[in-house]
Amino acid sequence: MRAAYRVRLMANLVNGSTLAGLLVAAAGRARLARAADGLLVGVRYRLPVPVAPAFTVGNVILARADWAALASREPLLAHEARHATQYAWCGGLFMLPLYFLAAGFSWGLTGDFGARNLFERQAGLADGGYSDKPLRPLLARFARSSGQPGEGAA
């Protein structure tokens, strides 16, 4: 395992986010398996929230699909692995309020929780199944009139 992944693994163990991920996996009756780079994957997650097909808490990736279906979606796994790194950088569960703030910011700008969410953009929008959305019309007009980039701005 590369040094960066060992650091992520240790950071998420120390900051408690991986333990939280294991508790969420247990609550959702997910079946856990080891994955590459110090990650764990819980498949057949059963709780109704969140509605996403996959999500990450610490070094634990949780998915509603079975292992075969998830393994065939390498870009999604890479996207979720990037979220594990974000947990390490944000000090663990401190990432959650930051993530929700970024999601609200994105929704305010575009009407979509992921399109302008800096965590989703850094993890790779397309890899996570998200698409870029334009600014809401009023915001786009304001951006154009103030000389700021509108539609293509991040």
Q: Which residues does each PLM region occupy?
A:
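Short pre-active-site segment immediately N-terminal to the catalytic Zn-binding motif
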Residues: 51-54, 61-77
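Metalloprotease/metallohydrolase-associated module, dominated by Zn2+-dependent proteases
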Residues: 2-36, 41-45, 49-52, 56, ...
